[in-house]
Amino acid sequence: VARKIRYVLIGGDLVDGVGIYPNQDKELVCQTIEEQLKKVEDLLSKIPNYIKIFIMPGNHDPGRRALPQPAIPKKYNSGLWEKENVFMVGNPAVISLNGVKVMMFHGQSIDDIVKTTPGLSYDKPTNVMKHLLRARHLSPIYGSQTPIAPEMEDLMVIDDIPDIFHVGHVHRAELDMYKGILLLNSGSWQKQTPFQASVGMTPNPGIALIVNLKTFKVYHENYNSNPLNNILQS
Protein backbone atom coordinates (compact mmCIF):
# COMPACT_ATOMS: atom_id res chain seq x y z
CA VAL A 1 0.00 0.00 0.00
CA ALA A 2 2.78 2.44 0.93
CA ARG A 3 4.23 2.35 -2.59
CA LYS A 4 0.93 3.62 -4.01
CA ILE A 5 0.61 6.64 -1.70
CA ARG A 6 0.93 9.95 -3.55
CA TYR A 7 -0.49 12.48 -1.06
CA VAL A 8 -0.30 13.07 2.70
CA LEU A 9 -2.80 15.47 4.27
CA ILE A 10 -2.13 16.86 7.75
CA GLY A 11 -5.19 18.56 9.21
CA GLY A 12 -3.51 20.77 11.76
CA ASP A 13 -1.83 20.60 15.15
CA LEU A 14 1.54 19.50 13.86
CA VAL A 15 2.84 20.26 17.34
CA ASP A 16 1.62 20.54 20.93
CA GLY A 17 2.37 24.25 20.97
CA VAL A 18 3.36 26.37 23.95
CA GLY A 19 0.99 27.82 26.55
CA ILE A 20 -2.10 26.26 25.01
CA TYR A 21 -3.53 24.94 28.29
CA PRO A 22 -2.60 25.16 32.02
CA ASN A 23 0.62 23.41 33.11
CA GLN A 24 1.40 22.33 29.55
CA ASP A 25 5.06 23.23 30.02
CA LYS A 26 5.42 20.35 32.50
CA GLU A 27 4.52 17.85 29.76
CA LEU A 28 6.71 19.22 26.97
CA VAL A 29 10.05 17.80 25.87
CA CYS A 30 10.61 20.65 23.39
CA GLN A 31 9.86 23.91 25.18
CA THR A 32 9.77 26.23 22.15
CA ILE A 33 7.59 26.22 19.06
CA GLU A 34 10.69 26.35 16.84
CA GLU A 35 12.09 23.18 18.43
CA GLN A 36 8.78 21.40 17.98
CA LEU A 37 8.47 22.36 14.31
CA LYS A 38 12.06 21.29 13.68
CA LYS A 39 11.08 17.82 14.91
CA VAL A 40 8.17 17.87 12.45
CA GLU A 41 10.49 18.89 9.63
CA ASP A 42 12.88 16.06 10.47
CA LEU A 43 10.07 13.50 10.46
CA LEU A 44 8.52 14.72 7.21
CA SER A 45 11.91 14.76 5.48
CA LYS A 46 11.79 10.95 5.62
CA ILE A 47 8.81 10.97 3.24
CA PRO A 48 9.92 10.55 -0.42
CA ASN A 49 9.78 13.68 -2.58
CA TYR A 50 7.29 12.14 -5.02
CA ILE A 51 4.67 12.24 -2.25
CA LYS A 52 3.01 15.65 -1.93
CA ILE A 53 2.35 16.82 1.63
CA PHE A 54 -0.39 19.34 2.46
CA ILE A 55 -0.11 21.00 5.88
CA MET A 56 -2.74 23.21 7.49
CA PRO A 57 -2.58 24.88 10.91
CA GLY A 58 -4.59 23.99 13.99
CA ASN A 59 -5.17 25.76 17.29
CA HIS A 60 -1.91 24.39 18.77
CA ASP A 61 0.24 25.67 15.89
CA PRO A 62 1.86 29.13 15.74
CA GLY A 63 0.14 31.98 13.94
CA ARG A 64 -3.29 33.53 14.08
CA ARG A 65 -5.80 31.64 16.21
CA ALA A 66 -8.93 33.20 14.76
CA LEU A 67 -10.68 31.48 11.85
CA PRO A 68 -9.94 31.44 9.00
CA GLN A 69 -6.30 30.79 9.78
CA PRO A 70 -3.51 31.65 7.33
CA ALA A 71 -0.84 29.01 6.79
CA ILE A 72 1.75 28.51 9.54
CA PRO A 73 4.09 31.55 9.25
CA LYS A 74 7.40 30.87 7.56
CA LYS A 75 9.34 32.61 10.35
CA TYR A 76 8.72 29.67 12.70
CA ASN A 77 10.18 27.09 10.31
CA SER A 78 11.41 28.05 6.86
CA GLY A 79 12.49 24.48 6.13
CA LEU A 80 8.91 23.25 5.70
CA TRP A 81 8.12 26.10 3.32
CA GLU A 82 11.21 25.40 1.22
CA LYS A 83 10.53 21.71 0.61
CA GLU A 84 9.46 21.06 -2.98
CA ASN A 85 6.84 18.48 -2.00
CA VAL A 86 5.31 20.42 0.93
CA PHE A 87 2.34 22.76 0.45
CA MET A 88 1.46 25.03 3.37
CA VAL A 89 -2.26 25.89 3.24
CA GLY A 90 -4.67 27.83 5.42
CA ASN A 91 -7.50 26.56 7.60
CA PRO A 92 -9.94 25.81 6.03
CA ALA A 93 -8.69 24.84 2.58
CA VAL A 94 -10.09 23.15 -0.53
CA ILE A 95 -7.62 21.18 -2.62
CA SER A 96 -7.93 18.97 -5.69
CA LEU A 97 -6.20 15.58 -5.73
CA ASN A 98 -6.42 14.01 -9.19
CA GLY A 99 -9.75 15.75 -9.67
CA VAL A 100 -11.09 14.74 -6.24
CA LYS A 101 -12.21 17.80 -4.27
CA VAL A 102 -11.07 17.64 -0.64
CA MET A 103 -12.26 20.16 1.94
CA MET A 104 -9.83 20.32 4.85
CA PHE A 105 -10.74 21.93 8.19
CA HIS A 106 -8.93 21.55 11.49
CA GLY A 107 -12.22 21.51 13.40
CA GLN A 108 -11.99 24.03 16.23
CA SER A 109 -15.74 24.70 16.06
CA ILE A 110 -16.43 21.11 17.14
CA ASP A 111 -15.86 22.33 20.72
CA ASP A 112 -18.75 24.80 20.47
CA ILE A 113 -21.13 22.37 18.80
CA VAL A 114 -20.50 19.53 21.26
CA LYS A 115 -21.21 21.89 24.17
CA THR A 116 -24.47 23.22 22.75
CA THR A 117 -26.02 20.39 20.72
CA PRO A 118 -27.66 17.45 22.54
CA GLY A 119 -26.58 14.02 21.33
CA LEU A 120 -23.23 15.09 19.89
CA SER A 121 -19.89 14.21 21.47
CA TYR A 122 -16.13 14.18 20.88
CA ASP A 123 -16.27 10.38 20.57
CA LYS A 124 -18.28 10.58 17.32
CA PRO A 125 -16.73 13.45 15.35
CA THR A 126 -18.32 12.49 12.03
CA ASN A 127 -21.75 13.24 13.53
CA VAL A 128 -20.53 16.78 14.20
CA MET A 129 -19.14 16.96 10.66
CA LYS A 130 -22.61 16.14 9.31
CA HIS A 131 -23.95 19.01 11.41
CA LEU A 132 -21.47 21.38 9.73
CA LEU A 133 -22.45 20.16 6.26
CA ARG A 134 -26.15 20.63 7.02
CA ALA A 135 -25.43 24.16 8.24
CA ARG A 136 -23.27 24.80 5.13
CA HIS A 137 -20.87 26.56 7.51
CA LEU A 138 -17.66 25.38 9.21
CA SER A 139 -18.13 27.48 12.34
CA PRO A 140 -21.86 28.18 12.68
CA ILE A 141 -21.77 29.42 16.31
CA TYR A 142 -20.46 32.95 16.82
CA GLY A 143 -19.30 34.34 20.16
CA SER A 144 -18.53 31.06 21.88
CA GLN A 145 -15.12 29.40 22.37
CA THR A 146 -13.93 29.49 18.74
CA PRO A 147 -12.49 32.88 17.69
CA ILE A 148 -13.67 34.10 14.28
CA ALA A 149 -11.91 36.96 12.49
CA PRO A 150 -14.07 39.84 11.14
CA GLU A 151 -13.24 39.35 7.47
CA MET A 152 -15.04 41.21 4.66
CA GLU A 153 -16.19 37.83 3.30
CA ASP A 154 -17.28 34.85 5.39
CA LEU A 155 -14.71 32.27 4.31
CA MET A 156 -16.20 29.62 6.58
CA VAL A 157 -19.27 29.20 4.36
CA ILE A 158 -19.35 25.89 2.48
CA ASP A 159 -20.00 27.04 -1.09
CA ASP A 160 -19.04 23.95 -3.06
CA ILE A 161 -19.88 20.38 -2.14
CA PRO A 162 -16.65 18.40 -1.61
CA ASP A 163 -16.00 14.78 -2.45
CA ILE A 164 -14.08 14.30 0.82
CA PHE A 165 -14.45 16.25 4.07
CA HIS A 166 -11.30 15.94 6.20
CA VAL A 167 -11.27 17.18 9.81
CA GLY A 168 -9.01 16.71 12.83
CA HIS A 169 -8.89 18.42 16.25
CA VAL A 170 -10.56 15.78 18.45
CA HIS A 171 -7.92 13.02 18.15
CA ARG A 172 -10.46 10.39 17.07
CA ALA A 173 -9.91 8.46 13.84
CA GLU A 174 -13.34 7.85 12.32
CA LEU A 175 -15.04 7.68 8.93
CA ASP A 176 -18.55 7.79 7.53
CA MET A 177 -20.50 8.74 4.40
CA TYR A 178 -23.05 11.54 4.16
CA LYS A 179 -25.00 12.18 0.95
CA GLY A 180 -22.13 10.90 -1.16
CA ILE A 181 -19.44 12.80 0.78
CA LEU A 182 -16.71 10.76 2.45
CA LEU A 183 -16.21 12.02 6.01
CA LEU A 184 -12.79 11.46 7.57
CA ASN A 185 -11.46 12.46 10.94
CA SER A 186 -7.79 11.64 10.75
CA GLY A 187 -7.22 11.16 14.47
CA SER A 188 -3.89 11.72 16.21
CA TRP A 189 -0.49 10.28 17.05
CA GLN A 190 -0.63 11.39 20.68
CA LYS A 191 -2.03 9.39 23.58
CA GLN A 192 -4.51 10.99 25.96
CA THR A 193 -3.10 13.91 27.95
CA PRO A 194 -4.41 15.01 31.37
CA PHE A 195 -5.97 18.06 29.72
CA GLN A 196 -7.81 15.94 27.15
CA ALA A 197 -9.13 13.73 29.92
CA SER A 198 -10.41 16.81 31.76
CA VAL A 199 -12.49 17.93 28.76
CA GLY A 200 -13.80 14.47 27.86
CA MET A 201 -11.58 13.60 24.88
CA THR A 202 -10.71 9.91 24.52
CA PRO A 203 -8.23 9.60 21.62
CA ASN A 204 -7.64 6.45 19.58
CA PRO A 205 -4.11 7.38 18.45
CA GLY A 206 -1.80 5.74 15.95
CA ILE A 207 -4.31 4.99 13.18
CA ALA A 208 -3.43 5.99 9.62
CA LEU A 209 -6.36 6.31 7.20
CA ILE A 210 -5.60 5.71 3.51
CA VAL A 211 -8.10 6.59 0.77
CA ASN A 212 -8.18 5.12 -2.73
CA LEU A 213 -9.07 8.22 -4.76
CA LYS A 214 -10.58 6.13 -7.58
CA THR A 215 -12.92 3.96 -5.52
CA PHE A 216 -13.12 5.98 -2.26
CA LYS A 217 -12.43 2.78 -0.38
CA VAL A 218 -10.68 3.53 2.92
CA TYR A 219 -7.92 1.38 4.36
CA HIS A 220 -6.30 1.77 7.74
CA GLU A 221 -3.02 0.89 9.38
CA ASN A 222 -3.06 0.56 13.16
CA TYR A 223 0.26 1.48 14.79
CA ASN A 224 -1.25 1.41 18.27
CA SER A 225 -0.54 -1.54 20.55
CA ASN A 226 -4.18 -1.50 21.66
CA PRO A 227 -6.86 -3.33 19.64
CA LEU A 228 -8.60 -1.13 17.07
CA ASN A 229 -12.09 0.00 17.96
CA ASN A 230 -14.64 0.33 15.20
CA ILE A 231 -13.89 3.55 13.31
CA LEU A 232 -16.72 3.11 10.80
CA GLN A 233 -20.00 4.80 11.67
CA SER A 234 -23.18 2.89 10.95
How does the language model describe each region?
Residues 1-234:
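Extended recognition/assembly regions associated with phosphoester-bond processing machinery
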